Amino acid sequence: MATAGKVIKCKAAVAWEAGKPLSIEEVEVAPPQAMEVRVKILFTSLCHTDVYFWEAKGQTPVFPRIFGHEAGGIIESVGEGVTDVAPGDHVLPVFTGECKECAHCKSAESNMCDLLRINTDRGVMIADGKSRFSINGKPIYHFVGTSTFSEYTVMHVGCVAKINPQAPLDKVCVLSCGYSTGLGASINVAKPPKGSTVAVFGLGAVGLAAAEGARIAGASRIIGVDLNPSRFEEARKFGCTEFVNPKDHNKPVQEVLAEMTNGGVDRSVECTGNINAMIQAFECVHDGWGVAVLVGVPHKDAEFKTHPMNFLNERTLKGTFFGNYKPRTDLPNVVELYMKKELEVEKFITHSVPFAEINKAFDLMAKGEGIRCIIRMEN
């Protein structure tokens, strides 16, 4: 493209300080360096992780910063050494990468790339420790290697998944984070047998995707656990068959679930990150064969406490990161599931706003309205 090798001036939503509305600014985006790509973002969406680090309550504040990591776009230009993708390719940016060289990438059992694993505190590119964004010569920091709240962004090539160009980017962009995290937690990690019973703790975006994954895997009972009863009706669309609100009971929720299921659920997936919910999700699975999968990210000082007999009685506890998907290897296949109509991504998308109104997406999330809000970069 004519812009290759040159600085691009474009619009970006800049967070100047914690918790303050984003400001649409003209930024300069430098060309990609070795093993980097510059991507034209067409659609992006707001994920709770963006809000969490934008609020920066207890996290390292890195500002000014361009947030955003759930998106779809087209490669504008590539840096030296990039052979996997070319200008014009359709891609999904991913907050965690796959270098394809490290021990994790070479292992069939891991997706925790040594080089490109998520780092929320780093606001610069790993190649040279510098930002590719600037305003009047002053750096604007990156977020989790993606920074998709910008018309153009620069990423390491290991953080983009090349996908089918026929796939609608305004739909499949949500597959680059939350949807795949929940879906994979069920399909790849919990692996519920056909006809089994699954409990899903937390019916936000990731929990609904986990319920969808359990439904696709063939679970016959999917019990949604949430403190907000207004989420129950929505969750039926994602396969939930029953609901438990812990507030409605005067006994621990793991006991309620055990009574409902003749001794415990076959699988549970915990999507809140609340340490008590994590413990409940483990203790509610059936002895002998029950498997609990932890997805939600806990408070940094949280401690998981349970009696060792819960393990000795043959319950299994697993953790997962990004649904155990390797971004570059596996995400194109998840997109193909959508193209074959095996995934109903549309149910996930409840709102859409133009880029100029990006702060509306933050307002919707603050009010707990909807699931995903698509931000349209061009109109």
From Swiss-Prot:
Similarity-based family: Belongs to the zinc-containing alcohol dehydrogenase family.
The gene coding this protein: ADH1
Binding annotation for Zn(2+) 1: C47, T49, H69, C177
Sequence positions that bind NAD(+): 49, 202-207, 226, 231, 272, 295-297, 322, 372
Note, other: In maize there are two isozymes.
One example of a Gene Ontology biological process annotation: formaldehyde catabolic process
Any single Pfam family the record assigns to this protein: ADH_N
Assigned keywords, A-Z: Cytoplasm, Metal-binding, NAD, Oxidoreductase, Zinc
Known outcome of mutating Y52D: In allele ADH1-Cm
Top enzyme category: oxidoreductase
Record-given protein name: Alcohol dehydrogenase 1
